[in-house]
């Protein structure tokens, strides 16, 4: 057998061990492949999010270790989709979602389509009291590293803006980037 000089498989478990320090909060994800027409990320827990992501491309989830809850929001409400260890799930484009990874040491793989010039990703926050949308931000994330670099800035900006965090419907103040309310995630 003649092995290819540059294309080689690698040990995923060792890769996770070598990158364990980057699979922790606040975002807890690490890009696996940079030179591809898809984005392959490894995501670690614990991490619970209080924002909802509006992705213009499909997202494929494979839960390697531990369980997660994928919160989904639409016009009728907020729902939970459990993704258990060993399970996969395909999320269609533009479905508002908030991955909840409350288990320490959980590991998942998320594969997304490549971003192209002009594509925008949205981030929305909903009132925990009445489920009204309190804020939305759209940003171009047309490079794989974009989400890793831009998410902390997006979250910080929202957390520091009292007006953006105040629900126009009921006046409740969203916690910003603080912890989600008790009972938000039940695995």
Predicted segment positions?
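Jelly-roll (double-stranded beta-helix
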Residues: 1-62, 67-88, 96-187
């Amino acid at each position: 057998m003649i092995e290819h000089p540059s294309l080689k498989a690698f040990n995923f478990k060792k890769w996770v061990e070598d990158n364990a320090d980057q699979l922790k909060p606040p975002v807890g994800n690490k890009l696996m492949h940079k030179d591809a027409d898809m984005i392959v990320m490894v995501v670690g827990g614990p991490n619970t999010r209080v924002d909802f992501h509006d992705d213009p491309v499909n997202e494929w989830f494979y839960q390697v270790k531990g369980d997660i809850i994928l919160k989904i929001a639409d016009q009728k409400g907020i729902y939970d989709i459990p993704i258990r260890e060993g399970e996969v799930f395909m999320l269609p484009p533009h479905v508002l979602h908030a991955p909840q990874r409350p288990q320490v040491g959980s590991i998942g793989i998320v594969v997304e389509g490549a971003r192209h010039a002009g594509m925008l990703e949205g981030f929305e926050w909903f009132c925990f009291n009445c489920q009204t949308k309190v804020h939305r931000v759209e940003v171009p994330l047309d490079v794989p590293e974009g989400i890793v670099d831009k998410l902390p800035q997006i979250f910080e900006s929202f957390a520091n803006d009292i007006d953006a965090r105040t629900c126009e419907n009921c006046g409740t103040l969203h916690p910003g980037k603080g912890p989600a309310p008790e009972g938000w995630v039940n695995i």
